Swiss-Prot record:
The keyword Repressor applies. GadX and GadW are part of a complex system required for acid resistance via the regulation of gadA and gadBC. Many of the described circuits use mutants missing one of the network components. In the wild-type situation, however, many of the scenarios are not easily observed. Coiled coil: none annotated. It comes from the Bacteria. GO terms for biological process: DNA damage response; DNA-templated transcription; regulation of DNA-templated transcription. Residues 139-236 form the HTH araC/xylS-type domain. Residues 156-177, 203-226 bind DNA. One of its GO terms (molecular function) is DNA-binding transcription factor activity. Depending on the conditions (growth phase and medium), acts as a positive or negative regulator of gadA and gadBC. Repression occurs directly or via the repression of the expression of gadX. Activation occurs directly by the binding of GadW to the gadA and gadBC promoters. Keywords: Activator, DNA-binding, Repressor, Transcription, Transcription regulation. Pfam families: HTH_18. This is HTH-type transcriptional regulator GadW. Homodimer.
Length: 242
């Protein structure tokens, strides 16, 4: 999968120019840049080390964020974030691990990439930068819904958060051969599946967490989507169901 952003480790202090401003980069600082910006700078390899992060990893990071403030600042156009004092032993270990053949399983690699992103979690601009790196409108809609699956979502809520119109979102989703209702349903059913697979949670609680006020309606929707009831599904999953 093509990368959408990059983490750069600075190994020698130098200056760059971004949007007509000089930015001083200090030794042992790290940068997070969107793909095009990272490619444009063409950092000299002796002075930097670089990790490219793909869209799936970005989505995994955003998926674990719940109940964000209503104003996410998604209109922000920041394309570069700097952490001047990251935990260098951890940073070095992460970068070194990708140079060791046979060490990085997909699961471990994903954890290391997520650790890199988390080093910018204190920056309020992180979520907008990652969100805007997602290439499709359907992907962005899915991520917004994932921030609060239990919410009673309407298309106008998505349009408000994306600072655009409902009609434009509809058109772009049609161009991607999907629609808002399909994305909402898929997001809720994916959450239901994860809860049934991983935890022992009462059915009415699972329904509520997935945005359904009626447990019977949730059961019917789940059966139509997966072809089995939640109880039947849970019987074949590692967890138990009550």
């Amino acid at each position: 999968m093509t990368h959408v952003c990059s983490v750069i480790l600075i190994r020698r202090s130098f200056d760059i120019y971004h949007e007509q401003q000089k930015i001083s980069l200090h030794n042992e600082s790290i940068l997070l840049l969107e793909k095009n910006l990272a490619d444009d700078f063409a950092f000299c390899s002796p002075d930097t080390r670089r990790l490219d992060i793909d869209e799936l990893t970005v989505c995994h990071y955003l998926q674990n964020i719940r109940q964000l403030p209503r104003n996410l600042g998604l209109h922000s156009k920041d394309r570069l974030l700097i952490n001047q004092s990251p935990p260098m032993p951890l940073v070095t270990a992460i970068f070194d691990s990708f140079n060791e053949s046979g060490v990085n399983s997909p699961i471990l690699s994903n954890m290391l990439y997520l650790s890199c992103l988390s080093m910018f979690s204190h920056k309020k601009e992180l979520i907008p930068l990652l969100f805007n790196s997602i290439s499709t409108v359907s992907g962005k809609v899915e991520r917004l819904i994932s921030f609060d699956i239990a919410k009673r979502w309407y298309l106008r809520d998505i349009a408000e958060r994306m600072y655009t119109s409902e009609s434009l979102i509809k058109k772009k989703l049609q161009d991607e051969n999907t629609c808002f209702s399909k994305i909402l349903l898929a997001s809720r059913m994916s959450m239901a599946r994860r809860l049934l697979e991983l935890r022992q949670i009462p059915l009415h609680t699972i329904a509520e967490k997935c945005g359904y006020s009626s447990t019977s309606y949730f059961i019917n929707t789940f059966r139509q989507y997966y072809g089995v009831t939640p109880h039947q599904f849970a019987q074949h999953s590692p967890g138990t169901f009550s």
